[in-house]
Amino acid sequence: MDVCHTDPAELSSGEAKELQQIKWHRKQLLEDIQKLKDEIADVFAQIDCFESTEESRMAQKEKEMCIGRKKFNMDPNKGIQYLIEHKLLTSDVQDIAQFLYKGDGLNKTAIGTYLGEKDPINLQVLQAFVDCHEFANLNLVQALRQFLWSFRLPGEAQKIDRMMEAFAARYCLCNPGVFRSTDTCYVLSFSVIMLNTGLHNPNVRDRPPFERFVTMNRGINSGSDLPEEQLRNLFDSIKSEPFSIPEDDGGDLTHTFFNPDREGWLLKLGGRVKTWKRRWFILTDNCLYYFEFTTDKEPRGIIPLENLSVQKVEDPKKPFCLELYNPSCRGQKIKACKTDGDGKVVEGKHESYRISAANAEERDQWIEAIRASITRVPFYDLLSARKKKIVGK
Protein backbone atom coordinates (compact mmCIF):
# COMPACT_ATOMS: atom_id res chain seq x y z
CA MET A 1 0.00 0.00 0.00
CA ASP A 2 1.47 3.30 -1.04
CA VAL A 3 1.72 6.06 1.59
CA CYS A 4 1.03 9.48 0.32
CA HIS A 5 3.31 12.18 1.82
CA THR A 6 1.97 15.69 1.57
CA ASP A 7 4.39 18.36 0.55
CA PRO A 8 4.13 21.21 3.11
CA ALA A 9 4.46 23.63 0.21
CA GLU A 10 1.16 22.32 -1.12
CA LEU A 11 -0.67 22.99 2.21
CA SER A 12 -2.63 26.09 2.84
CA SER A 13 -1.51 28.32 5.68
CA GLY A 14 -4.35 27.02 7.89
CA GLU A 15 -3.46 23.37 7.20
CA ALA A 16 0.24 24.03 7.83
CA LYS A 17 -0.59 25.65 11.15
CA GLU A 18 -2.79 22.70 12.16
CA LEU A 19 -0.01 20.27 11.25
CA GLN A 20 2.45 22.17 13.45
CA GLN A 21 0.02 21.98 16.36
CA ILE A 22 -0.37 18.23 15.87
CA LYS A 23 3.42 17.79 15.89
CA TRP A 24 3.70 19.94 19.02
CA HIS A 25 1.02 17.93 20.85
CA ARG A 26 2.73 14.71 19.78
CA LYS A 27 6.02 15.97 21.19
CA GLN A 28 4.28 16.99 24.43
CA LEU A 29 2.63 13.57 24.72
CA LEU A 30 5.96 11.80 24.19
CA GLU A 31 7.56 14.00 26.84
CA ASP A 32 4.68 13.34 29.27
CA ILE A 33 4.93 9.61 28.60
CA GLN A 34 8.66 9.70 29.32
CA LYS A 35 8.05 11.64 32.52
CA LEU A 36 5.51 9.03 33.61
CA LYS A 37 7.99 6.26 32.81
CA ASP A 38 10.66 8.06 34.84
CA GLU A 39 8.26 8.59 37.74
CA ILE A 40 7.17 4.94 37.67
CA ALA A 41 10.79 3.82 37.58
CA ASP A 42 11.53 6.13 40.52
CA VAL A 43 8.58 4.71 42.49
CA PHE A 44 9.75 1.15 41.86
CA ALA A 45 13.26 2.15 42.91
CA GLN A 46 11.87 3.65 46.13
CA ILE A 47 9.83 0.50 46.77
CA ASP A 48 12.91 -1.67 46.27
CA CYS A 49 14.89 0.62 48.54
CA PHE A 50 12.13 0.61 51.17
CA GLU A 51 11.83 -3.18 51.09
CA SER A 52 15.58 -3.50 51.36
CA THR A 53 15.65 -1.02 54.24
CA GLU A 54 12.71 -2.72 55.95
CA GLU A 55 14.34 -6.13 55.56
CA SER A 56 17.55 -4.68 56.94
CA ARG A 57 15.67 -3.07 59.82
CA MET A 58 13.82 -6.29 60.60
CA ALA A 59 17.06 -8.25 60.41
CA GLN A 60 18.65 -5.76 62.81
CA LYS A 61 15.71 -6.02 65.21
CA GLU A 62 15.83 -9.81 65.08
CA LYS A 63 19.54 -9.68 65.76
CA GLU A 64 18.98 -7.36 68.73
CA MET A 65 16.19 -9.62 70.02
CA CYS A 66 18.52 -12.62 69.79
CA ILE A 67 21.19 -10.69 71.70
CA GLY A 68 18.58 -9.67 74.28
CA ARG A 69 17.50 -13.28 74.84
CA LYS A 70 21.10 -14.38 75.28
CA LYS A 71 21.73 -11.54 77.73
CA PHE A 72 18.58 -12.51 79.62
CA ASN A 73 19.68 -16.14 79.88
CA MET A 74 23.02 -15.02 81.33
CA ASP A 75 21.71 -12.17 83.51
CA PRO A 76 17.91 -11.72 83.50
CA ASN A 77 17.84 -8.14 84.80
CA LYS A 78 20.44 -6.95 82.30
CA GLY A 79 18.64 -8.79 79.50
CA ILE A 80 15.33 -7.06 80.26
CA GLN A 81 17.12 -3.71 80.48
CA TYR A 82 18.76 -4.29 77.07
CA LEU A 83 15.43 -5.18 75.44
CA ILE A 84 13.76 -2.07 76.86
CA GLU A 85 16.63 0.20 75.78
CA HIS A 86 16.40 -1.19 72.22
CA LYS A 87 12.60 -0.72 72.20
CA LEU A 88 11.96 -4.45 71.80
CA LEU A 89 10.08 -4.45 75.09
CA THR A 90 8.34 -1.75 77.10
CA SER A 91 8.86 -1.19 80.80
CA ASP A 92 5.22 -2.09 81.44
CA VAL A 93 5.01 -5.09 83.79
CA GLN A 94 2.29 -6.71 81.66
CA ASP A 95 4.55 -6.55 78.60
CA ILE A 96 7.48 -8.05 80.50
CA ALA A 97 5.25 -10.76 81.98
CA GLN A 98 3.91 -11.74 78.55
CA PHE A 99 7.47 -11.90 77.22
CA LEU A 100 8.44 -14.30 80.02
CA TYR A 101 5.21 -16.28 79.72
CA LYS A 102 5.70 -16.89 75.99
CA GLY A 103 9.30 -17.76 76.78
CA ASP A 104 10.58 -17.90 73.19
CA GLY A 105 14.29 -18.67 73.37
CA LEU A 106 14.41 -18.06 77.12
CA ASN A 107 16.03 -20.36 79.66
CA LYS A 108 13.51 -21.47 82.29
CA THR A 109 16.11 -21.12 85.04
CA ALA A 110 16.64 -17.48 84.07
CA ILE A 111 12.88 -16.86 84.10
CA GLY A 112 12.66 -18.30 87.62
CA THR A 113 15.63 -16.21 88.72
CA TYR A 114 13.98 -12.99 87.47
CA LEU A 115 10.58 -13.81 88.96
CA GLY A 116 12.17 -14.68 92.30
CA GLU A 117 13.83 -11.31 92.86
CA LYS A 118 12.42 -9.12 95.63
CA ASP A 119 12.69 -5.77 93.82
CA PRO A 120 9.28 -4.04 93.43
CA ILE A 121 9.31 -4.33 89.62
CA ASN A 122 10.08 -8.06 89.82
CA LEU A 123 7.30 -8.62 92.33
CA GLN A 124 4.84 -6.84 90.03
CA VAL A 125 6.02 -8.88 87.05
CA LEU A 126 5.63 -12.09 89.11
CA GLN A 127 2.00 -11.21 89.82
CA ALA A 128 1.35 -10.35 86.15
CA PHE A 129 3.13 -13.54 85.06
CA VAL A 130 0.96 -15.69 87.34
CA ASP A 131 -2.12 -13.90 86.02
CA CYS A 132 -1.15 -15.01 82.49
CA HIS A 133 -2.01 -18.57 83.55
CA GLU A 134 -5.58 -19.78 83.19
CA PHE A 135 -6.35 -22.43 85.83
CA ALA A 136 -10.15 -22.52 85.55
CA ASN A 137 -11.60 -26.05 85.73
CA LEU A 138 -8.17 -27.63 86.33
CA ASN A 139 -7.49 -29.75 89.39
CA LEU A 140 -4.52 -28.73 91.51
CA VAL A 141 -2.04 -31.15 89.92
CA GLN A 142 -3.00 -30.04 86.41
CA ALA A 143 -2.55 -26.40 87.39
CA LEU A 144 0.80 -27.13 89.04
CA ARG A 145 2.00 -28.96 85.93
CA GLN A 146 1.21 -25.90 83.82
CA PHE A 147 2.69 -23.45 86.30
CA LEU A 148 5.91 -25.34 87.02
CA TRP A 149 6.51 -25.94 83.31
CA SER A 150 6.62 -22.21 82.60
CA PHE A 151 9.76 -21.55 84.65
CA ARG A 152 12.28 -23.23 86.94
CA LEU A 153 11.38 -22.89 90.62
CA PRO A 154 14.41 -21.38 92.41
CA GLY A 155 15.96 -22.96 95.48
CA GLU A 156 15.71 -20.23 98.11
CA ALA A 157 12.83 -20.67 100.56
CA GLN A 158 11.69 -17.03 100.49
CA LYS A 159 11.49 -17.02 96.69
CA ILE A 160 9.57 -20.30 96.66
CA ASP A 161 7.20 -18.90 99.29
CA ARG A 162 6.39 -15.79 97.20
CA MET A 163 5.87 -17.78 94.01
CA MET A 164 3.65 -20.43 95.58
CA GLU A 165 1.69 -17.75 97.44
CA ALA A 166 0.96 -16.06 94.11
CA PHE A 167 0.07 -19.41 92.53
CA ALA A 168 -2.35 -20.31 95.33
CA ALA A 169 -4.11 -16.95 95.10
CA ARG A 170 -4.47 -17.26 91.33
CA TYR A 171 -5.73 -20.86 91.50
CA CYS A 172 -8.39 -19.98 94.08
CA LEU A 173 -9.47 -16.96 92.02
CA CYS A 174 -9.90 -19.18 88.93
CA ASN A 175 -11.60 -21.97 90.91
CA PRO A 176 -13.77 -20.42 93.64
CA GLY A 177 -15.14 -22.88 96.18
CA VAL A 178 -12.54 -25.62 95.68
CA PHE A 179 -10.69 -24.61 98.87
CA ARG A 180 -11.82 -22.54 101.83
CA SER A 181 -8.70 -20.38 101.73
CA THR A 182 -5.55 -19.75 99.74
CA ASP A 183 -3.61 -21.21 102.69
CA THR A 184 -5.23 -24.58 101.99
CA CYS A 185 -4.18 -24.40 98.35
CA TYR A 186 -0.67 -23.32 99.36
CA VAL A 187 -0.17 -26.22 101.81
CA LEU A 188 -1.65 -28.82 99.48
CA SER A 189 0.54 -27.58 96.62
CA PHE A 190 3.65 -28.13 98.75
CA SER A 191 2.36 -31.54 99.79
CA VAL A 192 1.90 -32.50 96.15
CA ILE A 193 5.41 -31.31 95.21
CA MET A 194 6.90 -33.27 98.11
CA LEU A 195 4.79 -36.28 97.13
CA ASN A 196 6.26 -36.05 93.63
CA THR A 197 9.77 -36.18 95.13
CA GLY A 198 8.86 -39.07 97.42
CA LEU A 199 7.33 -41.15 94.63
CA HIS A 200 9.81 -40.48 91.84
CA ASN A 201 13.19 -39.35 93.20
CA PRO A 202 15.57 -42.33 92.81
CA ASN A 203 17.34 -41.33 96.03
CA VAL A 204 14.17 -41.87 98.09
CA ARG A 205 13.73 -45.51 99.12
CA ASP A 206 10.61 -45.18 101.27
CA ARG A 207 7.77 -44.49 98.81
CA PRO A 208 4.91 -42.70 100.60
CA PRO A 209 1.57 -44.57 100.44
CA PHE A 210 -1.74 -42.82 99.91
CA GLU A 211 -2.63 -43.12 103.60
CA ARG A 212 0.44 -41.07 104.56
CA PHE A 213 -0.54 -38.40 102.04
CA VAL A 214 -4.01 -38.21 103.62
CA THR A 215 -2.58 -37.99 107.13
CA MET A 216 -0.13 -35.30 106.06
CA ASN A 217 -3.03 -33.10 104.90
CA ARG A 218 -5.49 -33.54 107.75
CA GLY A 219 -7.16 -30.35 108.91
CA ILE A 220 -5.60 -28.10 106.28
CA ASN A 221 -8.94 -26.87 104.89
CA SER A 222 -9.50 -24.23 107.60
CA GLY A 223 -9.40 -26.94 110.25
CA SER A 224 -11.42 -29.48 108.24
CA ASP A 225 -10.28 -32.40 106.10
CA LEU A 226 -10.37 -32.32 102.33
CA PRO A 227 -12.53 -34.95 100.60
CA GLU A 228 -10.59 -38.21 100.35
CA GLU A 229 -11.68 -38.62 96.74
CA GLN A 230 -10.07 -35.27 95.89
CA LEU A 231 -6.80 -36.34 97.54
CA ARG A 232 -6.95 -39.72 95.80
CA ASN A 233 -7.23 -38.06 92.38
CA LEU A 234 -4.22 -35.86 93.10
CA PHE A 235 -2.19 -38.78 94.45
CA ASP A 236 -2.96 -41.04 91.48
CA SER A 237 -2.14 -38.27 89.00
CA ILE A 238 1.32 -37.71 90.50
CA LYS A 239 1.96 -41.43 90.90
CA SER A 240 1.20 -42.14 87.25
CA GLU A 241 3.04 -39.10 85.86
CA PRO A 242 5.71 -37.11 87.73
CA PHE A 243 6.13 -33.40 87.34
CA SER A 244 8.47 -32.46 84.54
CA ILE A 245 10.41 -29.32 83.74
CA PRO A 246 11.75 -28.18 80.36
CA GLU A 247 14.64 -30.07 78.79
CA ASP A 248 17.01 -27.10 78.97
CA ASP A 249 16.83 -27.13 82.76
CA GLY A 250 16.97 -30.72 83.77
CA GLY A 251 17.23 -33.37 81.10
CA ASP A 252 17.48 -36.77 82.73
CA LEU A 253 18.15 -35.13 86.09
CA THR A 254 14.72 -33.49 86.30
CA HIS A 255 13.82 -35.02 89.64
CA THR A 256 17.18 -34.33 91.19
CA PHE A 257 17.31 -30.62 90.41
CA PHE A 258 13.60 -29.88 90.57
CA ASN A 259 13.73 -27.85 93.78
CA PRO A 260 17.31 -27.06 94.78
CA ASP A 261 18.03 -25.65 98.23
CA ARG A 262 20.47 -23.17 96.72
CA GLU A 263 22.23 -22.53 93.41
CA GLY A 264 24.74 -20.05 92.06
CA TRP A 265 28.22 -19.34 90.73
CA LEU A 266 31.22 -20.18 92.94
CA LEU A 267 34.95 -20.73 92.44
CA LYS A 268 36.25 -24.25 93.14
CA LEU A 269 39.89 -25.15 93.75
CA GLY A 270 40.86 -28.31 91.86
CA GLY A 271 42.86 -30.01 89.14
CA ARG A 272 46.27 -31.66 89.13
CA VAL A 273 47.74 -28.19 89.05
CA LYS A 274 45.64 -26.45 91.68
CA THR A 275 43.66 -23.70 89.97
CA TRP A 276 40.42 -21.87 90.72
CA LYS A 277 37.63 -22.55 88.25
CA ARG A 278 34.21 -20.92 88.04
CA ARG A 279 31.41 -23.48 88.39
CA TRP A 280 27.63 -23.38 88.70
CA PHE A 281 26.70 -25.15 91.95
CA ILE A 282 23.36 -26.72 92.83
CA LEU A 283 22.61 -27.89 96.37
CA THR A 284 19.81 -30.44 96.60
CA ASP A 285 18.92 -33.78 98.20
CA ASN A 286 21.95 -33.75 100.49
CA CYS A 287 24.30 -33.48 97.49
CA LEU A 288 26.32 -30.65 95.99
CA TYR A 289 26.47 -30.71 92.18
CA TYR A 290 28.66 -28.47 90.05
CA PHE A 291 28.43 -27.66 86.34
CA GLU A 292 30.59 -25.81 83.85
CA PHE A 293 27.56 -23.90 82.50
CA THR A 294 24.02 -23.33 83.79
CA THR A 295 22.63 -24.94 80.62
CA ASP A 296 24.60 -28.21 81.01
CA LYS A 297 22.39 -31.26 81.40
CA GLU A 298 24.99 -33.33 83.25
CA PRO A 299 27.12 -32.14 86.19
CA ARG A 300 30.90 -32.07 86.08
CA GLY A 301 30.98 -33.39 89.62
CA ILE A 302 28.82 -34.69 92.47
CA ILE A 303 29.71 -34.33 96.15
CA PRO A 304 27.47 -36.34 98.53
CA LEU A 305 27.28 -34.41 101.80
CA GLU A 306 26.70 -37.44 104.03
CA ASN A 307 29.23 -37.49 106.92
CA LEU A 308 30.72 -34.17 105.76
CA SER A 309 30.99 -30.85 107.55
CA VAL A 310 31.42 -27.32 106.27
CA GLN A 311 33.40 -24.44 107.75
CA LYS A 312 34.85 -21.01 106.96
CA VAL A 313 38.54 -21.05 106.01
CA GLU A 314 41.20 -18.50 105.18
CA ASP A 315 42.99 -18.85 101.86
CA PRO A 316 46.05 -16.82 100.82
CA LYS A 317 44.82 -16.43 97.23
CA LYS A 318 41.05 -16.17 97.50
CA PRO A 319 38.77 -14.42 100.00
CA PHE A 320 35.41 -15.63 101.35
CA CYS A 321 36.26 -19.36 101.29
CA LEU A 322 34.43 -22.34 102.73
CA GLU A 323 35.65 -25.91 103.04
CA LEU A 324 33.90 -29.26 102.86
CA TYR A 325 35.63 -31.98 104.86
CA ASN A 326 35.07 -35.24 106.72
CA PRO A 327 35.62 -34.50 110.43
CA SER A 328 36.01 -38.16 111.39
CA CYS A 329 38.36 -39.15 108.54
CA ARG A 330 40.82 -36.31 108.05
CA GLY A 331 43.37 -37.11 105.36
CA GLN A 332 41.13 -39.60 103.54
CA LYS A 333 39.52 -38.99 100.16
CA ILE A 334 35.95 -37.77 100.20
CA LYS A 335 33.54 -40.08 98.40
CA ALA A 336 32.66 -38.07 95.31
CA CYS A 337 32.74 -38.38 91.54
CA LYS A 338 33.45 -36.17 88.55
CA THR A 339 33.52 -36.31 84.74
CA ASP A 340 37.00 -36.37 83.21
CA GLY A 341 38.08 -34.88 79.87
CA ASP A 342 36.91 -37.98 77.98
CA GLY A 343 33.45 -37.84 79.49
CA LYS A 344 34.07 -40.80 81.81
CA VAL A 345 32.81 -40.71 85.37
CA VAL A 346 35.73 -41.19 87.76
CA GLU A 347 36.17 -41.12 91.52
CA GLY A 348 37.15 -37.78 93.02
CA LYS A 349 40.57 -37.34 94.60
CA HIS A 350 39.84 -34.57 97.11
CA GLU A 351 40.53 -34.87 100.81
CA SER A 352 38.59 -31.62 101.16
CA TYR A 353 36.83 -29.19 98.83
CA ARG A 354 37.74 -25.52 98.97
CA ILE A 355 35.22 -23.11 97.47
CA SER A 356 35.26 -19.31 97.18
CA ALA A 357 32.18 -17.06 97.13
CA ALA A 358 31.83 -13.53 95.80
CA ASN A 359 31.46 -11.97 99.25
CA ALA A 360 31.18 -12.84 102.94
CA GLU A 361 27.38 -12.75 102.94
CA GLU A 362 27.15 -15.20 100.04
CA ARG A 363 29.71 -17.51 101.69
CA ASP A 364 27.75 -17.53 104.96
CA GLN A 365 24.48 -18.23 103.10
CA TRP A 366 26.06 -21.21 101.35
CA ILE A 367 27.43 -22.55 104.65
CA GLU A 368 24.01 -22.19 106.26
CA ALA A 369 22.28 -23.87 103.30
CA ILE A 370 24.75 -26.78 103.23
CA ARG A 371 24.38 -27.36 106.97
CA ALA A 372 20.61 -27.24 106.64
CA SER A 373 20.68 -29.66 103.69
CA ILE A 374 22.64 -32.16 105.74
CA THR A 375 20.10 -32.09 108.56
CA ARG A 376 16.65 -31.56 107.06
CA VAL A 377 14.38 -32.11 104.07
CA PRO A 378 13.52 -29.11 101.82
CA PHE A 379 10.05 -27.54 102.05
CA TYR A 380 9.24 -28.76 105.55
CA ASP A 381 9.84 -25.39 107.21
CA LEU A 382 7.53 -23.54 104.80
CA LEU A 383 4.89 -26.24 105.05
CA SER A 384 5.07 -26.41 108.84
CA ALA A 385 4.78 -22.64 109.23
CA ARG A 386 1.69 -22.45 107.02
CA LYS A 387 0.01 -25.39 108.77
CA LYS A 388 0.50 -23.62 112.11
CA LYS A 389 -1.11 -20.53 110.61
CA ILE A 390 -4.17 -22.53 109.51
CA VAL A 391 -4.54 -24.21 112.92
CA GLY A 392 -4.15 -20.85 114.65
CA LYS A 393 -7.10 -19.33 112.80
From Swiss-Prot:
SMART domains from the UniProt entry: PH, Sec7
| UniProt: a 1,2-diacyl-sn-glycero-3-phospho-(1D-myo-inositol-3,4,5-trisphosphate) binding residues | K268, L269, G270, G271, R272, V273, K274, T275, R279, Y290, R300
Keyword ATP-binding listed? The answer is no
Report which superkingdom the organism of origin falls in: Eukaryota
Intracellular or extracellular location(s):
Cell membrane
Membrane protein topology class: Peripheral membrane protein
Q: Which residues form a coiled coil?
A: 13-56
Q: Which GO terms describe its molecular function?
A: guanyl-nucleotide exchange factor activity; lipid binding
Region C-terminal autoinhibitory region, annotated ranges: 386-393
- Which InterPro entries has this protein been placed in? PH-like_dom_sf (IPR011993), PH_domain (IPR001849), Sec7_C_sf (IPR023394), Sec7_dom (IPR000904), Sec7_dom_sf (IPR035999)
Q: What UniProt keywords are attached to this protein's entry? A: Cell membrane, Coiled coil, Guanine-nucleotide releasing factor, Lipid-binding, Membrane
SEC7 domain span: 54-241
One of the record's GO cellular component terms: cytosol
> Which Gene Ontology BP terms does the record give?
regulation of ARF protein signal transduction
Q: Name one Pfam family in it.
A: PH
Cystine residue pairs: none
Keyword Zinc attached: no
- Indicate the segments forming the PH domain, all copies: 259-375
Q: What is known of its domains?
A: Binds via its PH domain to the inositol head group of phosphatidylinositol 3,4,5-trisphosphate. Autoinhibited by its C-terminal basic region.
* Protein's job: Promotes guanine-nucleotide exchange on ARF1 and ARF5. Promotes the activation of ARF factors through replacement of GDP with GTP.
Q: Which PANTHER family match?
A: CYTOHESIN-4, GUANYL-NUCLEOTIDE EXCHANGE FACTOR
- Under what name is this protein listed? Cytohesin-4
The scientific name of the source species is: Mus musculus (Mouse)
